[in-house]
C-alpha cells in the first residue's frame, strides 16, 4: 500500500485500515514498527497488517506530537521472501541506530556484508504451546526436525507460555456432559497423562540444547484451580494424582512456601526436577537482551485484563503470549499459538489467531516468525 501517506506522528497508523485490503494482508509505509492481526473467518488464511519502519533519520518538530513520534522512530525494513510454493514470509530487519548493522535469522550484517559467523538467538517466545492440542507437524516444525526453528536458530532460552492446556478437567467445561463424554470416547480424561505430555515436550526442547523457562500462565494455573474446586471422590480416573498433588501443596504451605502447582505436578510425574528447565512464578521477572519475558500477558494494570497496548506503557519492552495472535505495538510484542482456533475445541467465530513466534536477537532487536503450511521459513525445491 505504497500509495498511503500517513503522518509519522500517527500513534496507531494501522487502526483505520483493517478492511482496506479486503481479506489480504497489507504493508503500510510508516516510521513506527507495528503488526496488527487481521480479523478473518477461521477457514481463511491468517491476515496481518504491517508497518515497515523507516531508513530515514528522525527530524521531528520538538513539540509533544513530534517528541512522542521520535521515541517510536524505528530503523527497519520489512523483507519478504517467497518460496517455491508461493508462500510469503515477512521479516522485519531492524538496524542498530548507532551502527546500521542488523541480524537476520542466524546471520549478522554490517556495512561490509555478512560477518560469516553463526549467531544464536538470545531468546525465542513460541506461540502458546497447549501441549494436549499440539499436533505432530507443528512439533516437528518447531523443535523435532533437524531443520526446525529451534534446531536451526539454537535460541539460548525458549520461553514456554501455556505449556499445559488442562482441557481434560477445565473449569469452563467440566460441567458440560457433551464435552466430558467426548473426552471419555477419545481416552482423554487423565490429568496426570496430560501433565506427562507437557513434561515430554519440555524435555524435547531441552534436548536441542536450549534452556526452557516456563512462564506461569492462566492455563498452567488451572491445575491449582482444579485442586481447589474439584471433588476427587467423583473422579476415579484422577483421584490418586489429585490427592498426591494436593498433599504436595499442603506440605509446601506447612513449610511457608509459595504454591507452584504446575511445577509440582511436573516434578511428581518426572520423579524430580527437570534438567535445564526453570519455572517462573506469577509476576517474576525474566529478562532476555533487555526485554521483559516473565509475563504471560493475561494480567493487566490494577487487576484489569492484560492487553498489548497497555503493556506498551510499561517503559520496558515486553514479549508475551496469551492472545494467540501476532501483535506488535511499539515496544510490546505478543506471539500467537501452536494451534489453530479449530484445534482449540473451545473458541468459535471470527478470529485473529495465528501460528507465530517472537525471536529476540542478542542486541535486543526482534523478529516475528509467521508460519505457513507447517513451515517457519521459505522452502525451496533443490
Tell me what each language-model feature is.
Residues 126-129, 163, 301-305:
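Short, flexible loop motifs at catalytic/binding sites
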Residues 84-119, 364-382:
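A short C-terminal boundary segment appended to hydrolase-like catalytic domains
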Residues 80, 128, 158, 162-163, ...:
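Divalent metal-coordination and catalytic microenvironments
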Residues 135-257:
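Core catalytic region of metal-dependent phosphoesterases/phosphodiesterases
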Residues 70, 230-292:
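Active-site-proximal loop/helix segment associated with metal-binding centers of metalloenzymes
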Residues 105-139:
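Mobile, glycine- and charge-enriched loop segments
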Residues 5-86, 288-370, 374:
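Conserved beta-sheet core of the metallophosphoesterase superfamily
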Residues 27-28, 49-51, 89-92, 157-161, ...:
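A structural signal for short, well-ordered beta-strand segments and their strand-loop junctions
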